[in-house]
Every structure is written in C-alpha cells, then in structure tokens.
Amino acid sequence: MNDQINELQLKIERLENEISFKNGLISILSHDSKEMFGNFLWLIEALEDKTINEEDFFNLLPQIKSDARKNLQTIQDSTAWLKTQYGDFKIKPVKILVIDLFHHFEEKYADQLKEKSIKFHFKGDPNAFLTTDRLLLEYVLDKILNNAVKYSLPGQDIYLQEATEGDQVILSVIDSGTGIAEKYLSAIYSYDNPVFQGTSGEKGVGLSLKIVKNFVSLLQGNIQIISAENKGTTVSLFLSKFTE
C-alpha cells in the first residue's frame, strides 16, 4: 500500500511540474510576443505620424533587432521542447565521439568566439564516446555553450571537458566569466529567475535552461551548475555511456 501511495505521489508531482512548466512557457511566449509586437507597432506609428525622426528611428533599430532575435530564440526553444511532447517521440541513441561534438561547436561558434576573442578548448580523452540521442544532446550543449560565450569577457577561455567514470560520461562546459550569485542559483530553473545581459549586451531568453533540464531528464541524466559571481560557471552533464 505504501509503495502505491508513493508511486501516486511521484506521478502527481511529475504532473504538477509539467503543468507548471507549460503554464510558464505560455506566459513567457505571451508576454514576450506582446512586448515585441507592441514595440514594432509603436515604432511604425511614430514614423507614420512623424513623432519620431528618421535618425532616432534608425538608432532604435539595433534594440528592435535584439528583441526580435530574443523572441525568435524563445519560439525555437519552445518548438524543440514541443517536439518531445508528441506521443510518438522516442529517444534515438547513436554512438557519438565527444571530440566530434567539440569540433561541431567550435565551427558553429567560430564567429562569436572570434568577435569576443574567446578561445575554446577540449579537455579529456579524444577517443571518449557515449551512445545517446544526438539531437537532444546537441541542443543541451548548445544552450550551455551559448550562455558560456554570452557571459564570458573578451579574451577569456571556455572548455568542453570530458571525464568517463565507469558507465558514466561527464561533460562539462567551463568558463571564467561573470558567474551567478549564490542567491540566484536556487531559482536557476524556475520562471522567477532574473534574466541577465551578456558581457556585450546580449539578451537572455530566460527559458533555455528550463528546457535543458527537461531534455537532460529525457536522456536519463542529471545536470549540475556550480557558479560564483565574477569567478565563472561550470555546467556538468552526468550521462549514461549507453542510453537505451
């Protein structure tokens, strides 16, 4: 009887978490979309009514572009998550060399790394591998690395580190950027966490890490974030070497 009660409690907690996640997702999409389109409409009407001159109009375009990019990222993140909610979604494990992941992101982030003079390094066994869903893992690492670049200062280093312990592979993205104050760490996966600007004014969307945690669970793994203000952040993924 106790086992059945415990199982029901776990199911209730899981459903409550899913409902909370979906409600938060709808709230973010609604708020951000209204804000962005409201800004677009105001800017166009101001230009039509000649209450803003062309110089001020063009000066505001970089901010509008930044807001549009942020909202596009929110939609892309939401779409990625929604695909995992379809009834026929299944993990598709394939063998992945960790060094291949490094080279993939080294190429993908080449322009951003160059722009901020950041060096990207690999630490670990170049022959290390794991068998898991490549799309989900790449999404997770992409969001973590994106934050590392965003919150690193020009000239700093970022590492993708691999460590294999028995049947477990630990992948860590390590930076020495602005870090996160301890008071914010406990809320890092909630919808109440603050959204910080990157070191070059980049905007966060406040959603990616919530989806990252969800995807890591789908990969039957765990995520750990260790961070200190002005000392950098280490985000580690604890994954099974073989995922069924």
Where in this protein do the model-derived segments appear?
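Short beta-strand/loop element within the Bergerat-fold HATPase_c
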Residues: 155-167
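Conserved catalytic submotifs in the C-terminal HATPase_c
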Residues: 92-96, 114, 119-128
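Short conserved segment of the HATPase_c
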Residues: 180-192
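Conserved micro-motifs of the catalytic ATP-binding
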Residues: 86-91, 129-132
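Short helix-loop "hinge" at the ATP-lid/N-box region of the Bergerat-fold HATPase_c
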Residues: 148-149
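Short alpha-helical segment of the dimerization/phosphotransfer core of two-component systems
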Residues: 66-74
